[in-house]
Amino acid sequence: MSGGREAFPARLSFVLPFSLSRERIGRARFRRRGATPMIKSFGGKQPQIHPTAYVAETATVIGDVTIGRESSVWFGAVVRGDVFWIKIGDRTNVQDGTVIHVSNGTHPTVLEDEVTVGHNVTLHGCHVERGCLVGMGSIVMDAARIGAQSIVAAGALVSPGTIVPPRSLVLGVPARVKRQLTDEEVAGLEQFWKNYVGYVQQYKAEDAAAAAAAPASS
């Protein structure tokens, strides 16, 4: 990636829009077959998922996990709170293929409100503050903390114990703070989580329609 500010929006595509209509038929059939997410207790701890949140059919949520209002965990994602706790705040989205785990008894994983976590991210025993965007394929390691309204670029590796100031653009392997975000870029972060809150509502409506249309079991 070049260092020029003008290249930032074009070069970093963290969250790609998708068409819900392309998946409607297949997903409706999947729901009618009774598919549900794997939501599993561990060590006496049961995941606590707000009724307005959405967990996709092929996602896995295990153990001491809390998921807040209008948040979402998408297809193939794994949220594993087995050896410590995980908290996902309100209006936060964990996209397809992401893995969230913890450090055994030392570092939980916390995603504050309005965080967007892109596809195939690994978050391990770290803390991501409010309004951040964690780009596709990136890794954030134990005891790292990402300051509010920051962007972790796609493919970045945030090393253990790294502290990222608020409103930072972080990129590279190992990740470094490239620069501070502009007011315009910070304002643009809202659109990512707002999109996913909308997707939650659409998917819930699709599932309700599919359930209503399904024939009653004998």
How should each PLM-predicted stretch be described?
Residues 2, 13, 19-21:
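Serine residues within intrinsically disordered or low-complexity segments
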Residues 17-37:
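Short, Lys/Arg-enriched N-terminal segments with co-localized hydrophobic residues
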Residues 33, 37-48, 54, 82-90, ...:
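Glycine-rich hexapeptide-repeat left-handed beta-helix
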